[in-house]
Regions:
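Acidic, Ser/Thr/Gly/Pro-rich low-complexity segments that form flexible
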Residues: 222-602, 619, 623
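Acidic, polar low-complexity linker/tail segments
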Residues: 8-29, 108-157, 166-170, 482, ...
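…and closely analogous acidic/polar surface helices at protein-protein or active-site interfaces
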Residues: 49, 166-207, 381, 389, ...
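MIDAS-like acidic motif and immediate structural context at the N-terminus
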Residues: 35-38, 42, 149-177, 181, ...
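Short amphipathic secondary-structure patches
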Residues: 2, 47, 51, 61-123, ...
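Structural recognition of the beta-strand scaffold that forms the well-ordered cores
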Residues: 24-25, 55, 155-160, 208-212, ...
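Alpha-helical assembly-interface signal, strongest on the long, hydrophobic N-terminal helix that forms
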Residues: 2-79, 615
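Solvent-exposed loop/turn segments at secondary-structure junctions
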Residues: 121-123, 162-167, 214-218, 469-470, ...
């Protein structure tokens, strides 16, 4: 006899008992008492089974998501989810449940995984209690659902320090920091690539870009014709180092410069085929020439100029034998580095637009600083000018020799000098000097699909090719890391910025503080710094209130007329703080790594704090010191721990691809 039958029989006996009022009262009261007891017991059991079903449902959802990310077939995912669900039902009979799995229908960047479970609950006492009051026995069925949004795609920019100090040995190792970094970075790429290769149904599941940085960032010389570069000299920083008024029609009517609507143009027949085209840094690279070879003409003489006129033409000369035919070639080509845009565009992903010239990117062109590299202008073995040294480090050309007593500033900015032809056999510039000075890194490698072996190898080859040289400008590296994963120009390989199911991540590693080199030259050309991504700090930006670009939008803690290395570092730190906030507000996940920085060193401590503040919060880990807060995506690494730290980064990135 079942529980309900036993209960019914007991109640029946009381109902038929005629032995006094006690029996009658007992019969009257036992019915609601037993019904209440049945309801209490069954309700508690119902809540327990419902709770266990929900727990099993959540666990099955996470397990199914992992199978989808790993590339399992639809049928295998559903079977795995069912098995996982039933295994976690604890004391519930799987026969009383049913699981429905709805797979994502978007395999190119996310989607929603939905699991619904129905539970049929068989109460213990409620059916009998219902019969006692004239009701009918029944089971209870309820359904619960759980949804997980899959993040199937990932775009990662590796922003890696290539400054000179990366050639130092990593602490606790006998290896150079740059070599330790190469190994760790390639290991990270391999780990994520292996996971990506298992995702058969998803296009470009994991992509990596590489941004080597030092004093500047190299976007690549192949972009010299792109529309996001300033092709017409419209940017307000395009000509800040140049004085085109020195090329006036009065000085040379055949070859002069004219400004029209903010753009300088080539005027006069002396420009040849490029007449009436804009004067830009690109045009300067194209127009500077050097005599790179010569061939003797038999039985010949040549005319050698002894005295020049003010316009550069010969006044007196003599004949000398033999005569040579000289071959000229371009002196230098743009290597690919760009200057930082003026605020606010230096700390943003704003799309370059010719209607807003300050948004355009300008190629770096390090001016020839005061001092004449060669003194013999006519190859006769006799110096035509007297050398003047200003102790500048980037003296790679001759100053215009036909002005009496020029100042250092005039020597540096007089544009006529760049159209002199460098004589055959004249002194060469020192290594690293020239218009590409401070451009020391290899070009950016844009996003590559590392699920494809060939593209994965491109990233790894670019990592291997890194070489340390130059200062440290973390914000420029970070800004370009952001731009490589963005869908906005210049680099448009990233998925749409608004696409759900895709994470954009920038991993930044540096081994030191931000640096911008100061120089003591107040009595010379007033450069105040070496030339780098922010140009010379001695120059002010138009409309900024006489502030140099590096100091724009900085706090009162930054002395606006303090031209020291420490003040430059503080200014770069503030630029980085603003940039980090902007990137994170644009849903960029920022991970930062400090390499061999000591918390007990004041300078290192500032760099550590800045990097930690820049980093995003982890979505999965808690702060070990305060479990109520998320952990920061920051690693204070040493040379000895770098490999393990990058494994932790790989784990964090792997988790991003499962659920959000």
């Amino acid at each position: 006899m079942g529980r309900a039958g036993m209960l019914k029989a007991i109640v029946g006996e009381f109902r038929h008992d005629r032995r006094g009022n006690y029996s009658l009262m007992t019969a009257i009261t036992i019915v609601p008492l037993m019904a209440g007891l049945a309801l209490s017991v069954d309700y508690g059991e119902l809540l327990r089974q419902k709770h266990e079903t929900l727990n099993a449902l959540d666990a099955a959802g996470l397990a199914a998501a992992q199978q989808i990310v790993a590339g399992a077939s639809d049928n295998d995912v559903k079977a795995y989810a069912k098995t996982f669900f039933e295994t976690n039902l604890a004391r519930i009979d799987p026969a009383n449940t049913a699981l429905t799995v709805t797979l994502p229908n978007n395999n190119a960047g996310g989607g929603t995984l939905k699991l619904c479970a129905s539970l049929t609950f068989h109460p213990y006492f409620l059916p009998a209690a219902s019969l006692l009051i004239g009701g009918t026995a029944s089971d209870t069925t309820f359904t619960e659902c759980s949804e997980l949004r899959l993040k199937n795609t990932l775009e990662v920019a590796l922003v890696l320090d290539n400054s000179g100090s990366m050639s130092d040995l990593g602490s606790g190792t006998g290896e150079k920091r740059i070599n330790l970094l190469k190994s760790a970075a390639k290991q990270l790429v391999d780990t994520l690539a292996l996971q990506a290769q298992q995702m058969k149904q998803i296009t470009k599941p994991v992509q990596f870009s590489l941004v080597p940085f030092a004093a500047s960032v190299n976007v690549g010389p192949t972009h010299d014709q792109d529309g996001w570069m300033d092709q017409d000299g419209m940017s307000p920083i395009q000509h800040e180092d140049f004085d085109w008024t020195t090329m006036s029609a009065a000085n040379n009517p055949d070859k002069y410069a004219e400004k029209l609507n903010g753009v300088w143009y080539k005027r006069g027949t002396g420009w040849g085929e490029t007449k009436d085209q804009p004067l830009t840094r690109f045009s300067l690279y194209a127009d500077m020439t050097v005599e790179s070879g010569r061939e003797e003409v038999p039985n010949s003489k040549q005319y050698v100029c002894d005295t020049y006129k003010k316009n550069g033409t010969c006044q007196y000369g003599h004949w000398s034998a033999p005569e040579y035919i000289y071959t000229t070639s371009r002196y230098a080509s743009w290597q690919g580095c760009v200057e930082a845009r003026p605020y606010p565009y230096n700390v943003s992903d704003t799309t370059p637009d010719t209607t807003a010239p300050a948004t355009l990117f300008v190629p770096m062109f390090a001016p020839d600083e005061a001092g004449t590299l060669w003194l013999d202008f006519n190859r006769d073995g006799i110096n035509d000018v007297i050398g003047t040294s200003y102790n500048y480090g980037n003296n790679w050309w001759a100053d215009w020799p036909y002005v009496a007593g020029p100042t250092a500033s005039q020597r540096q900015s007089d544009m006529r000098k760049y159209f002199l032809v460098k004589p055959y056999g004249s002194q060469s510039a020192a290594a690293g000097d020239g218009p590409n000075s401070s451009c020391t890194t290899n070009p950016i490698t844009p996003l590559k699909d590392v699920s494809q072996d060939a593209e994965k190898q491109e990233i790894k080859d670019a990592i291997d090719a890194m070489a340390p040289n130059g200062n440290t400008n973390v914000p420029e590296g970070l800004a370009w890391g952001w731009r490589t994963v963005s869908s906005n120009p210049p680099f448009t390989d990233g998925r749409p910025n608004s696409e759900r199911g895709n994470d954009k991540v920038v991993v930044v590693l540096t081994d030191g503080a931000n640096t911008y080199s100061a120089v003591s030259d107040g009595s010379y050309a007033n450069n105040r710094s070496t030339y780098a991504a922010y140009g010379y700090t001695g120059l002010t930006y138009p409309g900024s209130g006489s502030v140099t670009r590096l100091f724009m939008n900085t706090s009162t803690d930054i002395g606006k007329t303090t031209y020291t290395g420490a003040n430059y570092t503080a200014a770069l730190d503030e630029q980085m703080k603003t940039l980090c906030a902007n990137a994170k507000n644009s849903n960029i996940l920022v991970m930062t790594v400090a390499l061999d920085l000591s918390p007990t060193d004041a300078s290192d401590k500032k760099a550590i704090d800045a990097l930690k503040a820049c980093s995003s919060d982890s979505r999965f880990r808690k702060d070990s010191a305060d479990p109520s807060k998320p952990a920061k995506l920051f690693w204070n690494a040493t040379g000895a721990t770098l490999s393990d730290n990058f494994k932790e980064i790989a784990n964090e990135l792997s988790n991003l691809r499962i659920v959000g």
